[in-house]
């Protein structure tokens, strides 16, 4: 069987994937900071993680995915105070919204979704280990990681070691900062009045954890000290992931993660997302524009994860057209009842076998999804050209291949009407179709057109075929 190859951000090379345990993959993905609704750039990272998981499952692995919820940090505390509401009540709303959104986008729920506030004890334990191993110091009641005690610091983000040494005397209390300000980072923040009632007692005094120690503690608890894959957006690479490596490897004296995978930034209409520019979108904003979740997902998935994605409304509409082409073929294939065998079917089956192999080659080569989709649509074109000659055996083989693709893409309608948001009663649909048929027989074409338009407004598309009227959900 062909190897899976991933680009490892740590080594900056493509590497054959070899899990620690033969049939299982331990995977950690940085989840949302629940201070607001997730925006479309966040969802690119979450859909990338979902794609990776589905490809690993396609290969035959059992995947244990851990995706955290950051429910205590600078932003969550600031926003909860501004809204005069407790941290727990404030973040609860956005936790629930996140789970609603990933369900809407067809993202599989993680095996575990640990919340930071439920794992303070584990964070304190790691900080105590780091202190014991000589990697920390205290200042003004806060505990910092001294990066000069960890020689490998900066390898993931490819920091200049000499510049790092020259500037390593500083320290930073903020959770987020850039490479130019690489400094000793905070593990435990001393309580200040700005924190309100958000604090925990610890051996270091009253306070709260830094952002970076949160993921270290939760990944360790659910995946162990050493696991296979860690993912996130490229903006997480530094300082967050760099600091995670330092914390875990300095605490436990062993390798933390074997493969680091990062997806690139998303821009909108060629520019960075900004509320002032009017190009800042949450999922809910896009749904309010009448765009389908499947088309949004397809738009976020159809470019290679290591390439910057230019997200546009026009692009979503093109994605919908691509989805409709496949859905239309699925719909028509299911009506085939021809049992005759012929040369066209034999050739199609051979081409299908080649397409399946090429699809594997693409997705197992660092998730080359754009190439994989190209293979699918080449086959769709071929099938449409030969459609009238296809028999049931070839039909079943084609549908099996499309179903395999969809288990990874999860954008097409394989016949599960519950997948669509339109849940109009089927009896009502069939009754309207019957009324339209009668109207046509009576040559009342105006009424027939009115019924067709009524069905369209319900999200139902009808087709007149030699076998009778067929309908599908748009």
UniProtKB/Swiss-Prot annotation:
Residues given in the record as ATP binding sites: 275
Motif 'HIGH' region, residue numbers: 32-42
Free-text comment on the cofactor: Binds 1 zinc ion per subunit.
Cofactor: Zn(2+)
Subcellular location: Cytoplasm
Catalysed transformations (reactions): tRNA(Cys) + L-cysteine + ATP = L-cysteinyl-tRNA(Cys) + AMP + diphosphate
This protein's UniProt keywords: Aminoacyl-tRNA synthetase, ATP-binding, Cytoplasm, Ligase, Metal-binding, Nucleotide-binding, Protein biosynthesis, Zinc
Subunit relationships: Monomer.
Protein name according to UniProt: Cysteine--tRNA ligase
Name of the gene encoding the protein in the UniProt record: cysS
């Amino acid at each position: 069987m062909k190897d899976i190859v991933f680009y490892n951000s740590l080594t900056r090379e493509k590497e054959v994937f070899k899990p620690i345990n033969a049939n299982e993959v331990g995977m950690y993905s940085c989840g949302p900071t629940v201070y607001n609704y997730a925006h479309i750039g966040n969802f690119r990272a979450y859909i990338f993680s979902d794609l990776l998981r589905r490809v690993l499952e396609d290969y035959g692995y059992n995947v244990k995915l851990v995706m955290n919820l950051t429910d205590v940090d600078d932003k969550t505390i600031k926003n909860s105070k501004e809204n005069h509401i407790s941290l727990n009540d404030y973040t609860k709303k956005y936790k629930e919204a996140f789970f609603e959104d990933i369900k809407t986008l067809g993202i599989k729920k993680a095996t575990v979704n640990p919340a930071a506030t439920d794992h303070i004890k584990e964070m304190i334990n790691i900080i105590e280990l780091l202190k014991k191993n000589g990697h920390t110091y205290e200042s003004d009641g806060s505990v910092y990681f001294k990066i000069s005690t960890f020689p490998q610091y900066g390898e993931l983000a490819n920091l200049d070691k000499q510049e790092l040494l020259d500037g390593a005397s500083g320290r930073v209390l903020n959770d987020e900062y850039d490479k130019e300000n690489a400094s000793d980072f905070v593990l435990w923040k001393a309580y200040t009045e700005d924190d309100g009632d958000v604090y925990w007692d610890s051996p270091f005094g009253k306070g709260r954890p830094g952002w970076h120690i949160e993921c270290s503690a939760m990944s360790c608890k659910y995946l162990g000290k050493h696991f296979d894959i860690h993912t996130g957006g490229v903006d997480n690479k530094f300082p967050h992931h760099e600091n995670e490596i330092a914390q875990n490897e300095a605490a436990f004296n062993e390798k933390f993660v074997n493969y680091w995978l990062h997806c690139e930034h998303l821009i909108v209409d060629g520019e960075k997302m900004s509320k002032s520019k009017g190009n800042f979108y949450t999922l809910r904003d896009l749904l309010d524009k009448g765009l389908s979740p499947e088309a949004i997902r397809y738009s976020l998935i159809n470019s290679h994860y290591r390439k910057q994605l230019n997200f546009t409304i026009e692009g979503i509409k093109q994605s919908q057209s691509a989805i409709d082409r496949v859905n239309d073929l699925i719909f028509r294939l299911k009506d085939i009842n021809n049992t005759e065998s012929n040369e066209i079917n034999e050739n199609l089956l051979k081409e299908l076998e080649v397409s399946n192999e090429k699809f594997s080659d693409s997705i197992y080569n660092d998730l080359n999804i754009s190439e994989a989709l190209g293979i699918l649509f080449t086959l769709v074109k071929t099938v449409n050209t030969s459609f009238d000659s296809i028999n049931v055996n070839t039909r079943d083989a084609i549908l099996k291949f499309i179903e395999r693709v969809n288990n990874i893409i999860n954008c097409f309608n394989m016949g599960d009407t519950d997948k669509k948001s339109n849940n109009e009663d089927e009896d009502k649909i069939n009754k309207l179709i019957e009324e339209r048929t009668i109207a046509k027989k009576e040559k009342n074409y105006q009424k027939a057109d009115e019924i067709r338009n009524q069905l369209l407004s319900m999200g139902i598309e009808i087709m007149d075929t030699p076998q009778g009227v067929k309908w599908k959900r748009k």
